[in-house]
Amino acid sequence: MPRQEHIRNFSIIAHIDHGKSTLADRILEVTGLVSDREKRDQYLDRMDLERERGITIKAQTVRIPFTSKTGRKYILNLIDTPGHVDFNYEVSRSLAACDGALLVVDASQGVEAQTLANVYLALDHDHDIIPVLNKIDLPSSDVDRVKAEIEESIGLDCTDAIAVSAKTGMNVDKVLEAIVERLPAPEGNLNAPLKALIFDSWYDSYQGVVVLFRVMDGVLRKGDRVRMFATEKSYEVIRLGVFSPDIVDVAELGAGEVGFLCANIKELGDAKVGDTITHTDRPASEPVPGFKEVQPMVFCGLYPTDAAEYEPLKASLEKLQLNDAAFSYEPETSQALGFGFRCGFLGLLHMEIIQERLEREFQVDLIATAPSVIYKVETVDGKTQDIDNPSKLPDPTRITSLYEPYVRMDIHVPNEFVGNVLKLCEEKRGIQKNMGYIAANRVVITYELPFAEIVFDFFDRLKSGTKGYASMDYEPVDYRESSLVRLDILINGEAVDALAVIVHRDKAYHYGRALALKLKRTIPRQLFEVAIQAAIGQKVIARETISAMRKNVTAKCYGGDITRKRKLLEKQKEGKRRMKRMGNVELPQEAFLAALQVGDE
C-alpha cells in the first residue's frame, strides 16, 4: 500500500473543447502508461458518443505511477469529470473524491461559463487549483490576456500558471511536477472505521454493478462485508482493483486511494453516486457529507414508431437505466401514439444523449414528444400535485394556483452581442439580476428565467444570436406562481394529447397560431377537409384548414345536362362528408417535431 504523502488525487476542470481529454491523453503518454501502439484520441472517453461529441459523460479514473525530478515515486489518481451543466451533481461528487484540480483554459478563447461553474464547485471543496493555459501552439492564443481574465473572474493567482500545448505535448512534464509539488496529499486515518465515497457506478453484465470509490478513512480489503449508508444493504467485496488504465486487481486499498469494487450488486440504485461505503461489523458514525438523490428536471414521451417495437423499447430503456441512475421512465398511453414511456432526464443534453443512444445502440425508431418540466399545481381542495405531462393538468376550474420552476443562468458573451442576449432573455420572460465585465470585451449576464422557456430552443437561439461565442450555465432556483394555461391541439375536433403544451397566458395566442400553421404545412392533404384548431379549454384561439384533395368527377361528362354534373358533384360532396365523419388523420413524425420548432420563425 503506498504511503499517503506519495498519493495525489486530482481532476481536470475545463469547458467543452478546451482540451481536457487531450491533456489527459498526453499525461498518460508522458508517464509511459499508454504505449504508442495503444494510443488514440480521448483515451478515457470509452463511449462512441463521448468521442463523437467531444464530451465526457461518465466519470473515469486512472492510476498513474510517476517518478518526479527528485527521484521520488508517486501515485497520481486522475479522476476525469463530466464538464457539462446537466451532470453537475456527478461533477461535485467526483470533485469531492479529489484533493486538488487542474483548471484548463483555452488560451485563445478565455474563461467560459461552465469552467466557472465547475471552479466554484471545486472551491466549495476547498481545493487547491493549478491554472493551466492550453493551446498555446495556436496563433490566436493570448496567454497574458487569459491570465488576467482568470485573475479577474475567479480570483486565482496566475503568476505560476503553466502554459502548455496538450496537442504537441509541450510543457506537460511541468504539469506533472506541479501536481506533485503544489497539490496536497490526501488526509485520512488508516486506523479509523472504513469510510469510502462512491463517485460513479455502472452496470457490467458479468459482474453486476461496478462501483468507483475513494477511500476517505480506514482500509478496504477483498472479502470484507460492506454496507451502503443510503440503502443500508450489505454486500461482500468479491473483487477490488484499480484502473491503470486497464484493470489491475489489488488485495486492499487504504485511505486516500481510488479504485473500484464488485460485490454482486444487482441494481445501480443500490450503489448511488455520492453514497458512503462502510464496514458492516465496524461502521463509521456518519457518512461523507453532500449526498443527495438526483431528481429528473426535464420530461418527454418516447413512443415506438411501430406498436410491435414496444417490448424492444422497454428492454432498451431497462438496459440504459442500469447504466444511468439519473434517468427514469414509466409506461404511459397516448390516444394519438399508443403505448410508450414518460421519461425523465437531468437536462437537455442528457435527453438528447439518451435518445441518440436508443437509436444508435439499440436500433429503436422513436417518436419523441415536446419536452416539459415539472409544474406544481394547487387544487381547490388544498392539495399540491406535481405535473410532468401537460395532458395530466387538472380542469382549470379546480386549480387555485400554478407554479413553474425558475433557474438562475450565467451567460458569458463578447461585448458586441450583449443586445441580442438581453433581447432573447426578455423575450423568454427573464428577470435580469446582474451584468458585469470580466475582461475588456467579455460580459457576464445573470438572469432568472422560467425553466420551461429554455427547454425548447433557447440554446440554439443563443448560439445563433452570438455567432456561437456565448456560453451558458444554469442552476435551479425555486418555484414561482405564474399565469399558465394548457394549450390543446384539435384535429377535426379530436384533441391530440401528445401535442398539448403548457404555456404562459400572454404567449398562448402567438404560440397556438404558429403551431397550427406549422402543422398545416406538415400534415399531408387528405381526401377530406382537415381542421386544425388550437384551444384553451373550450375557447378556440387559432384555426387552420387543410383543403381536401379534389378529384374531377365531371370529367367524363361531355356536354349534356347540367343536372347530371350537379348530381355527380352532390354525390362526391356526400361521400366526403361521410369520410370526414369516419376518417382518421395519420399524423407524421414531423407533426410532433413541429411543436419543438415553433420558436424558429
From Swiss-Prot:
Which amino acids does the record list as binding GTP? 17-22, 134-137
Q: Where are the transmembrane segments?
A: none
The protein in question is named Elongation factor 4
Q: Where in the cell is it found?
A: Cell inner membrane
Hey, which family's this protein in? Belongs to the TRAFAC class translation factor GTPase superfamily. Classic translation factor GTPase family. LepA subfamily.
Which residues does the UniProt record annotate as the domain tr-type G? 5-187
Source organism per entry reads Nitratidesulfovibrio vulgaris (strain ATCC 29579 / DSM 644 / CCUG 34227 / NCIMB 8303 / VKM B-1760 / Hildenborough)
UniProt enzyme class: hydrolase
Q: How does it sit in the membrane?
A: Peripheral membrane protein
